[in-house]
């Protein structure tokens, strides 16, 4: 491994963006095998023997962090045993939310009860579980609501992993973490954000191949483009944007169209989003919530969203 383009975290460089944004990952012994859509393979020898494992980078800055690699592999164990033997087939699903709307070809990948990753079509009303990987194809999009009312939406040709979630209203604890590999996305915090109001602490994190977004009681739009660069448009709350390794922080705390775009792995701040940035976001984001969806901020009983959508379609 060599030094990262971002800092001294060890890094191995990928041939091109097809391996970064569209590669299929497989653990073969201690090796990590990445296959791009054309069927070309790239082997990271002894990846699982590194401590820490290297970032898998492009020379322009974006990369796959060890956490993202683990999430893409859907391994039901943590980083502390990532170099261990085969995954335990006893996988307990932990519900984190549900799909409120799915239009077009939307699929989910998750670890099945036999220890193998399964791919399923997604429809309105389906439950979502910790570790689920959502994929939208073509012009498809999907809207999800977590148990606390947090909303997370994905636009066309997008890929994201619901890597971590917890919510205990009685204990006033919770967190939401997601990896977005490509595509447009929208986030709006629910009860977790309200519980953390006034605290100097992030309650949610969105990670991409080029940025990490720390969130406090916020609403935002974002997009990961075909080169792995990330654009964020601030709508509300307090956002801290860093590079892949958590360095070079930039704060977005101005309500309005403040935006950030990452280039060569280092965040840059723009007080006002450019017309080009706005156009790119709007092209890749899912449709905004309807007035009925906006009224339902804190979640509801199962079935309510489905009934609303059916009424809209009739």
Where in this protein do the model-derived segments appear?
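Short intrinsically disordered, low-complexity coil segments enriched in acidic
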Residues: 1-3, 314
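Flexible, surface-exposed loop/linker segments and immediately adjacent secondary-structure boundaries
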Residues: 3-42, 46-138, 142-301
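Beta-propeller domains
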Residues: 296-314
């Amino acid at each position: 491994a060599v030094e990262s383009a971002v800092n001294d975290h060890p890094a191995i460089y990928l041939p091109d963006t097809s391996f970064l944004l569209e590669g299929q990952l497989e653990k073969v012994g201690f090796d990590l095998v990445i296959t791009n859509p054309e069927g070309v393979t790239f082997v990271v020898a002894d990846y699982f023997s590194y401590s820490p494992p290297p970032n898998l980078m492009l020379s322009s800055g974006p990369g796959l962090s060890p956490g993202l690699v683990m999430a893409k592999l859907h391994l039901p164990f943590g980083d502390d045993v990532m170099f261990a033997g085969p995954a335990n087939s006893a996988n307990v699903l932990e519900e984190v939310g549900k799909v409120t709307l799915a239009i077009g070809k939307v699929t989910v990948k998750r670890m099945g009860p036999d220890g193998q990753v399964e791919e399923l079509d997604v429809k309105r009303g389906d439950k979502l579980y910790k570790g689920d990987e959502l994929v939208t194809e073509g012009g498809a999009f999907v809207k999800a609501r977590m148990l606390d009312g947090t909303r997370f939406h994905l636009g066309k040709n997008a890929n994201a992993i619901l890597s971590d979630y917890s919510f205990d209203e009685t204990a006033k604890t919770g967190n939401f973490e997601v990896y977005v590999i490509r595509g447009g996305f929208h986030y709006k915090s629910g009860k977790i954000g309200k519980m953390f109001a006034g605290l100097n602490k992030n309650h949610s994190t969105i990670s991409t191949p080029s940025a990490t977004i720390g969130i406090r009681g916020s609403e935002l739009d974002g997009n990961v483009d075909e080169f792995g660069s990330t654009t964020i448009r601030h709508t509300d709350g307090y956002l801290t944007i860093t590079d892949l390794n958590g360095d070079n922080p930039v704060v977005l705390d101005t309500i309005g169209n403040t935006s950030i775009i990452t280039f060569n792995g280092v965040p840059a701040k723009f007080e006002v989003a450019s017309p080009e940035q706005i156009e790119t976001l709007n092209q890749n984001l899912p449709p905004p919530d309807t007035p009925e969806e906006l009224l339902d901020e804190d979640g509801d009983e199962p079935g309510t969203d489905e009934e609303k959508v059916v009424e809209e379609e009739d």
